[in-house]
Amino acid sequence: MDNLVERFLRYVSFETQSNSSVTQCPSTSGQIVLAEQLKNELIELELVDVELDENGYVMARLPSNVEHDVPAIGLIAHMDTAPDASGKDVVPQIVENYQGGDIALGIGDEVLSPIQYPDLRKLLGHNIITTDGTTLLGADNKAGIAEIITAIAHLKANPDIKHGDICIGFTPDEEIGRGANLFNVEKFGAKWAYTIDGGPVGELEFENFNATSADVICHGVNVHPGTAKNKMINSMNIAAQFQLMMPTEETPECTEHYEGFYHLKSMEPSVAKTELGYIIRDFDRKGLEQRKVFMQSKVDELNSSLTKGRVELILTDCYFNMREMVEPHQHIIELAKEAMIACDVKPDIKPIRGGTDGARLSFMGLPCPNIFTGGYNFHGIHEFITIEGMEQAVRVIVKLAEKTSEKYQ
């Protein structure tokens, strides 16, 4: 586990927040800066085929150290952090041997409380890395990067651990849904892969949401308020009417497990035009289609009731549930389970209430389930990770490489 924490702390110091309003890839220059750093580290580890392409994708390969044929496996993590909270000037703090109670985040009023985050009660005695309460931490997904590189370094330093080819990929812009857009599966060279992008220890995921974005555009008419009678149509009022037509019990804060939702994620209001940005999620493809039909029906209903003004709906499919692409390859899941069990980690198979690069890659011909990092509360200032969880992830990655080699002897 040499240098694992040091690597992680180094990577979170890079500002790599992605930006959905930018069309180029990567969407922010900071991701290229981190990519250059990772490329240099992989070269220092004497990996082969190390490459940073013009779109910010980093790839490399640890060659097999066995004579028999073993399918090449891939390990993937993303370099960007979520736009939901600042990732600039991250100041991690390490709480050693956590003994319970609130953890003060920096010098402000923010705390990490076991009342609000009960998972903390399971982590007594652990060493926890938190934020200072002003930014996210970046464990999503820089912990995955640190764990992959540490595992590869361990395999390099211990040639007695047998393994086949291991392909490494670090992607940009995952948090804005574009991480797989320009990923070259053929060049990557793996038969299957794992994203190291999950949460608490034991998570193993090969199901994710089907996802659609829904832009509701409400059109009004702007007139000077002093002469607006019978002329002005305030699009914000139309937008408010639409939001009130949506089911209040089918939102992220009211759903769990396999339940889908509608989520109003953004608003751009003005009198003349208001844009509502929704995301629609459902684990069942048919359920997603029904949700899209429901939203269109509400748009039609609202339009029919308006004497002035109008509403339009733009639906864009983002990604689909990888289960249909991964299930035919059950050995991929079984190998991950065996690796976890061999490391005294109980596999916790659950659906991802979100998406990963692996979801898209699975539909591009690279089956790609998701493995834990040891982190919690991603995308916000209460994000944290345990050092022990990170170490477990490294052990599982190493064991996964070893188990794959053994299986194909």
From Swiss-Prot:
Its main location: cytoplasm. It catalyses: Release of the N-terminal residue from a tripeptide. InterPro entries: ArgE/DapE_CS (IPR001261), Bact_exopeptidase_dim_dom (IPR036264), Peptidase_M20 (IPR002933), Peptidase_M20_dimer (IPR011650), Peptidase_M20B (IPR010161). It is an enzyme of class 3 (hydrolase). GO terms for biological process: peptide catabolic process; proteolysis. Its EC number is 3.4.11.4. Zn(2+) 2 binds at residues 140, 175, 379. The keyword Hydrolase applies. The keyword Protease applies. Zn(2+) 1 binds at residues 78, 140, 197. The active site is at residues 80, 174. It comes from the Bacteria. Binds 2 Zn(2+) ions per subunit. Its cofactor is Zn(2+). Disulfide bonds: none annotated. Belongs to the peptidase M20B family. Cleaves the N-terminal amino acid of tripeptides. This is Peptidase T. It comes from Photobacterium profundum (strain SS9). The lineage of its organism: Bacteria, Pseudomonadati, Pseudomonadota, Gammaproteobacteria, Vibrionales. The gene is pepT.
